[in-house]
Amino acid sequence: LRKRNYLNNKDILSEIHRSKNTFCSYVDNELHHQFDIIVSSVDEINKDTVEEARKNKAKRLSTAEYERRKMAGEKVKQAECEVSPDSITKEELIFRVMTFDHIPEEPGRKKNPKTIADTKVKLNFPPFQHFKYNEEDEIICVGKSHWQGGMENGSFSLGHGKATDKLALMWLKLVDRYATRGNVRGYTYNDEMKGQAILQLAQIGLQFDESKSDNPFAYYTAAVTNSFVRVINIEKRNQNIRDDILEMNDMNPSYTRQNEGEWEASVKRNEEASHSSFTDFSPSSED
């Protein structure tokens, strides 16, 4: 039976990109939304990064062409769809620069700011700008995150975008699948754990930084795991408090507490029995 892939990094990355684009403004949405390389500053745009960006763009175009022809029903080899990096001009490349330059400051948001992000408005994902070479070989800004309007006459905006419906469905699917794992599916508060995990993904789902990793599935799984464990720990603490109150009032605690007590007592009895049988045994001496 063929194994079915219900979620993969490629699809998740694509939806994260589309979701972030709803918070961005570009000079030309079709030409400037897709970045070819991520750098930390404009100073890093040089000959080496240009060559790397060419290779990245060629690989992406080759894969897209292969999938397009395959979907059209053609019997085609991937080698036939290869795009040469040399065929891509420098002016076609888009550089994503991770920067806070266009984000307004918010003094006092953090008592002891440690990074530049602590001095700026709180954002739903790391901010960036898109740059490219123009015909005069100058590097110009063609896109900004958390922005509305033109590059020069636009304004900062935080609430005009949203996660795509497909990305939201991916979050729900991931939580549903995680909730069926053997170590969590038996809990009576399984729904509370799922709700907490969905809330967590809605809050941090777009904070995934493509410049640091290309594995959003692991990022999301870790967030879901933390949410489930947090609810389990809270419920266990509440149950222990409830059982303590019941025992203080000479009432029977939960079956979990009773079973734990019986188990601990049986373990103790077995240990004492094995210890006494060992010490009482004395081999007979031969004359």
Model-derived features with residue positions:
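Active-site/pore-lining binding-face segments in mid-to-C-terminal subdomains
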Residues: Y219-M251
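Extreme N-terminal regulatory/targeting segments of RNA polymerase sigma factors
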Residues: L1-Y189, G261-E262, S277-D287
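Intrinsically disordered, low-complexity, charge-dense segments enriched in Lys/Arg
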Residues: N240-D287
